[in-house]
């Protein structure tokens, strides 16, 4: 029996990978500027972008908070796995470029589980080119136990791939398939794919070809131009979705969600961050981990969000990721669901 099996974002969680805050850093190169900090692409502003190692104290606090998350999930009967130890900050080189490594905080960004298949995504940042090495032993174990394991074609990520000065949402050119796994949400037979600065059109086309006729990949255009979809849409259970009111409108809401009940996320607490420039906005607080229908992990500082969820019959497990804005990972991002109960269904109501 395969140890891998996920069909959506909400079925009861049985096994999960939780990332680590050991030695993450931000590598200064063209891809980081285009994908994460394009507003600093002008003359003389590159130096304002935070690069290099993160503060030790923040990493220690984050690692402690991740361990608390692990313990809570274990207490709920969930099997918890962690990345293998490695020097994630070691330089990454190809014939075209060189970058510092990135880190292994967010397994969600690089690996996508669809059914019994684990897919290595062709990630947009050069620094993350070899990030899947942190999970290699786990992937081999899952393969030996009956899962499928495929990898998208390794992208070249040459200079021409990026357009830092281009319009938001068009800074990742369509020269080869490139996308982060966190650009994708699973709704049974339907997958939402965010076309943005961390996922291009060719990426959606490759994903559809890899998954075949059993699935429909829906490219979401004009929804959110920056990175990842989990701070914009959060499916909570069949027919109920949390939406970001600053981004989602009647016009750009994906068609498969139009018959679902929508909950607008309230304004989130203005969490602090170390340094002068945050990695992400306060909407990182929408990055929730659904443990099962009716229970989600949410940052305890977002009290109004917790109240809204509870009014809609969703219980909360309040925990904390103090440095989410600095490190760029909420509870959805720092986890990768490996197995959930349930079967493949279609959720078009």
UniProtKB/Swiss-Prot annotation:
GO molecular function ontology, one term from the record: scyllo-inosamine-4-phosphate amidinotransferase activity
Gene that produces this protein: strB2
Assigned keywords, A-Z: Antibiotic biosynthesis, Streptomycin biosynthesis, Transferase
Q: Could you tell me what reaction this enzyme catalyses?
A: 1-amino-1-deoxy-scyllo-inositol 4-phosphate + L-arginine = 1-guanidino-1-deoxy-scyllo-inositol 4-phosphate + L-ornithine
State what this protein does. It is not obvious if strB2 participates in streptomycin biosynthesis as an inosamine-phosphate amidinotransferase. Attempt to measure its activity have failed and the nucleophilic cysteine which is the key residue for amidine transfer is not conserved but replaced by a glycine residue.
* CDD domains according to UniProt: amidinotransferase_StrB1-like
Designated name of the protein: Putative inosamine-phosphate amidinotransferase 2
Task: Classify the source by domain of life.
Answer: Bacteria
Q: What is its EC number?
A: 2.1.4.2
EC primary class: transferase
What does the similarity note say? Belongs to the amidinotransferase family.
GO biological process per UniProt: streptomycin biosynthetic process
**What pathway is this protein said to act in by its record?**
Antibiotic biosynthesis; streptomycin biosynthesis
Q: Where is this site: Corresponds to active site cysteine in strB1?
A: 333
């Amino acid at each position: 029996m395969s140890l891998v099996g996920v069909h959506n974002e909400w079925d009861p969680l049985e096994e999960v990978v939780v990332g680590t805050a050991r030695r993450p850093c931000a590598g200064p190169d063209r891809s980081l500027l285009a994908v994460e900090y394009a507003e600093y692409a002008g003359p003389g502003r590159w130096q304002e972008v935070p690069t290099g190692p993160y503060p030790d104290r923040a990493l220690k606090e984050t690692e402690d908070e991740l361990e608390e998350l692990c313990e809570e999930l274990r207490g709920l009967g969930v099997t918890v796995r962690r990345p293998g130890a490695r020097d994630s900050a070691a330089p990454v080189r190809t014939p075209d470029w060189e970058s510092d490594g990135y880190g292994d905080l967010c397994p969600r960004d690089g690996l996508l589980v669809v059914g019994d298949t684990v897919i290595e995504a062709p990630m947009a940042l050069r620094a993350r080119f070899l990030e899947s090495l942190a999970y290699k032993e786990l992937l081999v174990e899952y393969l030996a136990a009956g899962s499928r394991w495929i990898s998208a074609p390794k992208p070249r990520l040459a200079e021409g791939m990026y357009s830092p000065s281009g319009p938001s949402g068009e800074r990742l050119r369509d020269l080869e398939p490139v996308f982060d796994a966190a650009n994708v949400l699973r709704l049974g037979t339907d997958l939402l794919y965010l076309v943005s600065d961390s996922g291009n059109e060719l990426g959606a086309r490759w994903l559809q070809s890899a998954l075949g006729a059993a699935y429909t990949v829906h490219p979401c255009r004009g929804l959110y131009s920056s990175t990842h979809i989990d701070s914009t849409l959060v499916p909570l259970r069949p027919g109920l979705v949390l939406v970001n009111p600053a981004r989602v409108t009647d016009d750009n809401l994906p068609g498969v969600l139009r018959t679902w009940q929508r909950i607008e996320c309230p304004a989130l607490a203005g969490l602090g961050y170390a340094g002068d420039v945050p990695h992400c906005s306060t909407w990182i607080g929408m990055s929730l981990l659904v443990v099962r229908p009716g229970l989600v992990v949410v940052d305890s500082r977002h009290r109004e969000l917790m109240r809204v969820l509870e009014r809609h019959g969703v219980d909360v497990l309040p925990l904390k990721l103090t440095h989410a804005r600095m490190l760029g990972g909420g509870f959805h991002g720092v986890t990768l669901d490996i197995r959930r109960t349930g079967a493949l269904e279609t959720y078009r109501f």
